[in-house]
Amino acid sequence: MHVAALQNHLAPLLVPCSRVYAACMAVRRRFWESPMSPAFRPSRPVVSVGNIAWGGTGKTPLVDWLLHWAGTRGLNPAVLTRGYGAKPPTVPFLVGSQHTAEEAGDEPLMLARRNPYAAVLVDPVRRRAGRWAEHELRPHFYLLDDGMQHLAVRRDLDLVVLRPDDVLDQWGRVLPAGSWREGASALKSATAFFVKSSPEVFEALAPVLEERLAPYGVPVFSFWLRPSGLLRVGGNEQRPHFDGAPYVLVSGVGGPGQVGETATRYFGYAPVRHRVFPDHHPYGPDDVRSLAQEGAQLVCTPKDAVKLERFAGLDLWTFDLQTVFGPAIGTAAPFPQWWDERWARLARERAGTS
């Protein structure tokens, strides 16, 4: 039985537990946000990118876009991330392009390679990593990855990523009766909301987005991932497409359905097979042998590529992905323009308090 169906079936038992859990999380939030809490406030601005629900929502592409934005402006940011599944030799662990996904985690390694001017720090205690960066690196600003519930580091801006389902069937459904980590009151902290969806889906969602998110008084932006080409994993070769040849899609991410839609839209035809692995899957030799026997071109996500590149002899391609912003609610400005203006205001505010 699917998790959501099981939660619906057990709702009479789970809903009371959810209310208790949501109340505990609200108390926790009030404690960490109080002036008396031991939360760490760096001397430079902190931008949190997080989500209300568990699972993949598109946080990493948004973090990647912000890092690219910083690089084009000569800014050196520091990313504070837990590094899901990482086994770093020391903490905090400053990720470099030479490290492995096992050491750094798949997403931190991908971010570090795509943005070499950024300091990507893996540490389950992000407050400790922030203090280390404050002393050793002096970054221009901090990005708190998956930071909505990580309140031990104070933030100036809270960018909250939502899935379409979060504003539909899962709205307000807190663990264990739903997928939300906190109750709807936590959304009051948001500086802006983001929904990873195509413009068509976002337009269809607009009425419910306005009804449920308008009370928070902040803009809602849409974004999606658009491939600009294919890159050979472990090499430098590039190509635009497979010339109509069949392909097998490989993904171990939180939203495999969206990966399939992206691939089909890019190639103009669906994969002959979609090999779906769990999120953050640690690929092993058996997986690679199975993939090598597929008999078609193999294409994977960049997140999977950093884990599969170590296997020699696997003819594998990955997407060169770009984050694209679309329609918005609550502002006439496209997100890049809104962000430039919001960042300039934050920089002035922090300069005035330093």
From Swiss-Prot:
Pathway: Glycolipid biosynthesis; lipid IV(A) biosynthesis; lipid IV(A) from (3R)-3-hydroxytetradecanoyl-[acyl-carrier-protein] and UDP-N-acetyl-alpha-D-glucosamine: step 6/6. Its EC number is 2.7.1.130. Keywords: ATP-binding, Kinase, Lipid A biosynthesis, Lipid biosynthesis, Lipid metabolism, Nucleotide-binding, Transferase. It comes from the Bacteria. Signal peptide: none annotated. Pfam families: LpxK. ATP binds at residues 53-60. It catalyses: a lipid A disaccharide + ATP = a lipid IVA + ADP + H(+). GO terms for biological process: lipid A biosynthetic process; lipopolysaccharide core region biosynthetic process. GO terms for molecular function: ATP binding; tetraacyldisaccharide 4'-kinase activity. The keyword Lipid biosynthesis applies. Coiled coil: none annotated. It is an enzyme of class 2 (transferase). One of its GO terms (cellular component) is plasma membrane. InterPro entries: LpxK, P-loop_NTPase. Transfers the gamma-phosphate of ATP to the 4'-position of a tetraacyldisaccharide 1-phosphate intermediate (termed DS-1-P) to form tetraacyldisaccharide 1,4'-bis-phosphate (lipid IVA). PANTHER family: TETRAACYLDISACCHARIDE 4'-KINASE, TETRAACYLDISACCHARIDE 4'-KINASE, MITOCHONDRIAL-RELATED. Belongs to the LpxK family. This is Tetraacyldisaccharide 4'-kinase. It comes from Nitratidesulfovibrio vulgaris (strain ATCC 29579 / DSM 644 / CCUG 34227 / NCIMB 8303 / VKM B-1760 / Hildenborough) (Desulfovibrio vulgaris). The gene is lpxK.
